[in-house]
């Protein structure tokens, strides 16, 4: 009986993200190429280690490698495109007093940054 339950659980988890599904960033209007440029412009790498971004080797914030595989954003929000954009635009509103500064990103800029982060697997 335990093996049956374990098998069904693994099938349910495996079915959560269908093979061949479009990357998350394609579904919400972000562009990872623009996101990469925005990450550089906003100097996100001063605080974060970000794969693929030159000189992004900061140690203040968490490293952002494999971001697409995380279950939460900043440990407090579900890792969905909408929640990530919200966090990128207003981190102090989400968690007042945290180390992430308000970025001043527009909605489109935040979508682009999110699109780049979702390429990190």
What are these model-predicted stretches?
Residues 13-15:
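C-terminal motif of bacterial Sec signal peptides marking the signal peptidase cleavage site
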Residues 17-40:
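Electrostatic cytochrome c docking/interface patches
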Residues 1-4:
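Bacterial N-terminal signal peptides that target proteins for export
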Residues 30, 37, 55-121:
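Extracytoplasmic electron-transfer domains, predominantly the class I c-type cytochrome c fold
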